[in-house]
């Protein structure tokens, strides 16, 4: 975990804004799927709701197993909602991740087995079947996931090859950004291909003789100036920064329930802790050390940095001090709200 976190921080410094980062192609998007399922094999952490027992009875009845009403009373099963995102151009046999959330009073879904569950779109059609062993989320055991837990059974048809143009939709309404993207695309191709239709939509015509796939790839990977707001992407399951770790934090003071963080241009100032359980005087590595008293100071005891403090510096410091990920996220949101970082925060599970 420690090494993955360090690698993720290094990769985040290579992250730059492209057209793909701040726009979607109209018509090419994920579709949300949902289904009702049952989990079995829980070690006494399931629920005892009547509708869960009824669902199990119906399932067994469909398998020609007759169970008298009221004879099932087990905390080893749970009723759940199963959701998934069907990627654009997903094909039959593809595997996709599914997310699990309990409906009743189950305490945990960890290591439970999701029985085969139909996942439907808003049109009522079944697009995938989910099944497998669940891994509970660290911060909330009543939710979980199954990587590659669903198999795509039906495809959503979209004839991309027949298109001679695409329309970009900005994630956020901005006349400045729409105009800039129009200019960048036209400059890149050396001809008038892009036209901003409004402050959020840009129509882009495909050059003659170029495949639509190559065209989309070229357009989406055009790099944009730093005037675009950066994105901070955090993987909640791995508790790591995927992108945006190099974002500099402006001077700010954040007061939380158990600590206060002061950040200045030269580094993280002292952090006042009221938590007596923090371990002190422990060497963590060559460039990271917890001081003789529970404080954080990049210039001295904690993390040495020649540059102004970044999001990665702050997150690393808070992780070393054993703060939970929720506390770190809340702190970053407070820093954003106070204007010390101009960034969109995206949490991924």
Swiss-Prot record:
Q: Does the keyword Signal apply?
A: yes
**Any one of the GO BP annotations:** bacterial-type flagellum-dependent cell motility
Q: What is its main location?
A: periplasm
InterPro entries the UniProt entry points to? Flag_FlgI
Signal peptide extent: 1-16
| Pfam (any one) | FlgI
Arranged from A to Z, the UniProt key words for this protein are:
Bacterial flagellum, Periplasm, Signal
Q: Where in the cell is it found?
A: Periplasm; Bacterial flagellum basal body
For whether the record's keyword set contains Signal, the answer is: yes
The UniProt entry's GO CC annotations, sorted and at most eight, read: bacterial-type flagellum basal body, distal rod, P ring; outer membrane-bounded periplasmic space
* Annotated GO MF terms: structural molecule activity
The protein's assembly and partners: The basal body constitutes a major portion of the flagellar organelle and consists of four rings (L,P,S, and M) mounted on a central rod.
Function of this protein?
Assembles around the rod to form the L-ring and probably protects the motor/basal body from shearing forces during rotation.
Q: Which family does it belong to?
A: Belongs to the FlgI family.
Q: What is this protein called?
A: Flagellar P-ring protein
Question: Which organism is this protein's natural source?
Answer: Aliarcobacter butzleri (strain RM4018)
